[in-house]
């Protein structure tokens, strides 16, 4: 006697139940795909190490030791993560509206230089240190906002590609900073390395709660939360997502796309400028060529790995900061150049770019609850 099988026992029924048991694709894809990209990057880099007769196990063990194994290494990783959080936000916010800005490095450099310059006439004037620091922060953020806002204005008013314009503006910013540091604002005492006049000890913000981590980490955390709220819980953020998804539709709905572009670029520039302030007031104590160390470009990797989510930028920045912090240990123990970490970051970046093609294409991730396709 034949018996009819229940719908749930058929392959299609099992597949439907599996789909229903999965979280929504919009929640699971941004987690699984970047993690898979990181794993693939680690495998590719392991092949690279084996080709150099180096042990992948030793390398990743040293990365753990240099970035997470002790309180000292954790502080080192957090200190390097602080500017990455801010520059990651500087890329992530414009990306939410569909803009690809590469100008965080230039905004960071000019922001840090502006903070150092405005502090020069106020040092020794008797003004409270908190007031001077506030002016420095405002100057750095304003300079960064203006500089990256210029790329947004060129895009809106003249149709200039924002990726090209922001990248060119970065090189212009570095050239301007070099001229000012080596020329009118050079400290006569800086013989070997041209720098501005050093900041006084009351204007240094290098220790947070008695640790070696500077206050830039706290600033980055606060901004990440605030910008997450703005981009996900406000009408501005909703309108920005609409414009980022379909610019013509947003314009057809009468949304002020141009003003939103300028606002996102200004916010991004403010974040990068703030990173420049902390580089001056917490790390170097003056503006010099060390401001242009690549944090602005590393922020692109952070934002990509975080899928332009302001909150996700924080843990990703800590991960990349740990990689940077362990570079010296890898160099000493494995006799490899410090640029090895840049190779790994480049592999991660390329893998992330390739992984973007898988969004919406994996059958087991492209269903919402109930079995409807996304």
Residue ranges and their predicted role:
Residues 1-40, 46-47, 245, 252-259, ...:
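Cytosolic-side transmembrane-helix boundaries in multi-pass membrane proteins
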Residues 266-272, 278-346:
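Transmembrane alpha-helical segments in multi-pass inner-membrane proteins
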Residues 146, 209-286, 310-311, 315:
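Helix-loop-helix "hairpin" substructures at the membrane interface of multi-pass membrane proteins
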Residues 45-53, 62-122, 137-163, 249, ...:
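Single transmembrane alpha-helix segments in multi-pass membrane proteins
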Residues 22-32, 52, 95-104, 127-191, ...:
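Short loop segments and helix-boundary regions at transmembrane helix junctions
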Residues 40-69, 180-181, 228-235:
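Structural signal for alpha-helical transmembrane segments and their membrane-water exit/capping regions
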Residues 162-233, 286, 367, 371-373:
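Transmembrane helix-bundle core of multi-pass membrane transporters
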Residues 33-50, 87-91, 112-118, 140-145, ...:
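Hydrophobic core segments of alpha-helical transmembrane domains in multi-pass membrane transport
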């Amino acid at each position: 006697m034949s018996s009819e099988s229940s719908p749930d026992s058929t392959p299609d029924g099992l597949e439907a139940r599996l789909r229903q048991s999965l979280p929504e694709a919009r929640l699971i894809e941004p987690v699984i795909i970047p993690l898979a990209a990181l794993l693939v990057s680690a495998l590719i880099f392991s092949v690279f190490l084996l080709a150099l007769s180096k042990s992948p196990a030793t390398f990743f063990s040293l990365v753990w030791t240099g970035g997470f194994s002790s309180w000292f290494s954790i502080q080192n990783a957090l200190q390097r993560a602080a500017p990455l959080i801010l520059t990651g936000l500087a890329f992530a916010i414009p990306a939410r509206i569909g803009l690809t800005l590469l100008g965080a490095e230039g905004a960071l450099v000019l922001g840090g230089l502006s903070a150092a310059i405005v502090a020069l006439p106020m040092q020794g004037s008797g003004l409270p240190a908190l007031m001077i620091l506030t002016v420095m922060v405002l100057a750095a953020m304003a300079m960064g906002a203006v500089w990256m806002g210029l790329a947004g204005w060129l895009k809106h008013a003249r149709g200039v590609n924002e990726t090209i314009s922001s990248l060119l503006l970065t090189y212009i910013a570095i050239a301007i900073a070099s001229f000012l540091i080596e020329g009118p604002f050079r400290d006569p005492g800086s013989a070997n390395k041209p720098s501005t006049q050093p900041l006084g000890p009351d204007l240094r913000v290098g220790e947070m709660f008695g640790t070696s981590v500077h206050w830039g980490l706290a600033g980055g955390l606060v901004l990440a939360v605030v910008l997450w709220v703005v981009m996900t819980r406000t009408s501005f953020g909703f309108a920005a997502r609409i414009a980022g998804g379909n610019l013509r539709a947003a314009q057809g709905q009468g949304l002020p796309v141009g003003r939103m572009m300028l606002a996102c670029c200004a916010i991004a520039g403010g974040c990068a400028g703030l990173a420049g302030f902390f580089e001056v007031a917490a790390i170097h104590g003056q503006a010099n060529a060390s401001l242009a160390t690549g944090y602005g470009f590393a922020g692109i990797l952070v934002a990509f790995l975080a899928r332009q989510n302001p909150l996700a930028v924080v843990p990703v920045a800590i991960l990349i900061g740990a990689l940077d912090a362990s570079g010296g240990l890898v160099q000493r123990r494995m006799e490899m150049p410090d640029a090895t970490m840049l190779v790994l970051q480049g592999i991660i970046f390329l893998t992330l770019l390739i992984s973007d093609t898988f969004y919406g294409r994996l059958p087991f991730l492209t269903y919402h609850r109930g079995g409807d396709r996304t």
